[in-house]
UniProtKB/Swiss-Prot annotation:
Family stated for the protein in its record: Belongs to the adenylate kinase family.
Gene that this sequence comes from: adk
Region (LID), start-end ranges: 126-165
GO cellular component: cytoplasm
UniProt comment concerning the protein's domains: Consists of three domains, a large central CORE domain and two small peripheral domains, NMPbind and LID, which undergo movements during catalysis. The LID domain closes over the site of phosphoryl transfer upon ATP binding. Assembling and dissambling the active center during each catalytic cycle provides an effective means to prevent ATP hydrolysis.
Name the record gives this protein: Adenylate kinase
Entries under InterPro entries matching the protein: Adenyl_kin_sub, Adenylat/UMP-CMP_kin, Adenylat_kinase_CS, P-loop_NTPase
Length: 225
């Protein structure tokens, strides 16, 4: 099963992606990790990407898409894959769609997690880290994992907030890109939605990202089949 996963920062997309990975035995591939791996290994395409990054420029699609395709063709992708974090524009969606089809890896499913922008922002700003274990879930805006004051709900350890989780300008900037239905990430998602509505060659799934993690998972698994 070959899946594209869309969702704003704060939607719980990463959590659901990990669940899909385990249930369907496919890798959860994050586009940023592909860049980091190629750059750290010093691959030729990684070196080219690094030149743009070091100049503060966007890496062109002519480099990004072949890099992504290379990862999607790795041995661990025999059962499929879940790609997260790309594309981020309609133009990139068109190019990726064409490249996947040419490589014989046409998409099976596109998932869009839907969440109100303010709720997504609150979830990011509400995240708290436990001094004993960062994997202990605590969020002052999510009732199911709301801590007891400034103490971890799991172990009672002291909690703190990551500085980047409190940077409203940075959060707003990321969300501006994601929620832009004309040129941003949602525009790329809607490109695939139009294909699904036109000929059904790809399955387009929408998920309500507001309920609890188990509830969202149940909806996702039910729709994936």
């Amino acid at each position: 099963m070959r899946i594209l996963f869309f969702g704003p920062n704060g939607s719980g997309k990463g959590t659901q992606g990990s669940i899909v990975k385990g249930k369907y035995n496919i890798p959860h591939i994050e586009s940023g990790a592909i860049f980091r791996e190629n750059i750290s290994k010093g691959t030729e395409i990684g070196k080219k990407a690094k030149e743009y990054i070091d100049r503060g420029d966007l890496v062109p699609d002519e480099i990004t898409i072949p890099m992504i395709l290379g990862r999607l063709q790795a041995d661990d992708c025999g059962n499929g894959w879940l790609l997260d974090g790309f594309p981020r524009s309609k133009e990139q969606a068109i190019k990726l769609d064409e490249a996947l089809k040419e490589a014989g890896m046409a998409l099976d499913v596109v998932i869009e997690m839907i969440l109100d922008r303010q709720i997504a922002k609150n979830r990011i700003m509400g995240r708290r880290l436990c001094e004993n274990d960062n994997n202990h879930p605590n969020n002052i805006f999510i009732d199911a994992i709301k801590p007891d004051g400034d103490k971890c709900r799991v172990c009672g350890g002291a909690l703190s907030a990551r500085s980047d989780d409190q940077d409203e300008d940075a959060i707003d900037k990321r969300h501006n890109i994601y929620y832009d239905t004309d040129t941003g990430t949602l525009a790329s998602a809607y490109y695939f939605k139009a294909i699904a509505e036109k000929d059904g060659s790809v399955k387009y799934i929408t998920l309500n990202g507001e309920p609890s993690v188990p509830e969202v998972t149940d909806e996702l698994v039910g729709k994936l089949g």
